[in-house]
Amino acid sequence: MRGYGALITTYGVGELSAMNAIAGSLAENVPVISIVGVPATKTIENKTCVHHNFQDVDYHACYEAHKHVTAAAAFLTRDNAKMEIDRVLKTFVKERKPVYIAVPLDIAKMEISDKEVSYDWISDEETLRLVSNKIAAKINNAQKPVILGDLLVKRFDSRIEYKEFVEKTRIPTTNFLMGTNLIDMDYDLYLGGYYAGFENPTAEKYVNETDCLIAVGPVYTCLLYTSPSPRDRG
C-alpha cells in the first residue's frame, strides 16, 4: 500500500526506543504501524521476569503507554486477535495515523475464532447529501471564494482529487506551508503560498477579503501565525 509505513521491534527496549518516532508520526499525521513481538502468553500470565522487562513485571505497561501516542492500540490474545487486528487496521487506513499491535510469541500458532468481523465503511448517504448541498450552496453564492490547501491533502493521498476540484471550480487557490506543491505553481489561478512571516500581498488580500474560505486538509498550529516577517527579522 502506498503511503504507509511499518516497523517491527521487540518488547520493552525496542518499542520504547521507537516510541518517540511513533509520537512524532502522530503529531505529523504519518501512518505507521508498530508491530511489537512480546513473550509467550504463559510468560505474560505468570508475570515471569525475563530480559528487556521492568523488574516489577507488567507486560502491558508499554502497550498502555502507546495508547497515548497512537490512533489505536491492541494487545493480542487468543480471544481478541481477529477482532483487534481488524479494528486497528481499519483505524490505520481511515485516519492515516500511527497504530500499535503487540503480538505474543505463541499467538500465530493458536487456533482463533473464525467468526466474521464486518465493518461498515459506507457514509450516511442522507447526511452526506445534506452537507454536500450546504457546501455547494455556500460556494455558489460566494462572490470571492478562495481555496486553501494544507498538509492533510497529502497525508490522505488526495492530491489528484484536490487538483481536479481546483481546476473544475476555477476558484483562486493558495496554501499553508505544509500544503506547498499540491498543484502546479504556474497554474493561472494559483496565488502563491499563504505563510506566516513571508509577505505575499496577493494571497493575503484574497484570504483577508474572501466571503468563503474553503480550507481543505488544514492543520492549524502556531507556525501559521507567529513567524516574524522578513521585514521584522531585518
Which stretches of residues belong to each language-model region?
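N-terminal alpha/beta PP-like core and its mobile active-site loop of ThDP/TPP-dependent enzymes
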Residues: 1-227, 231
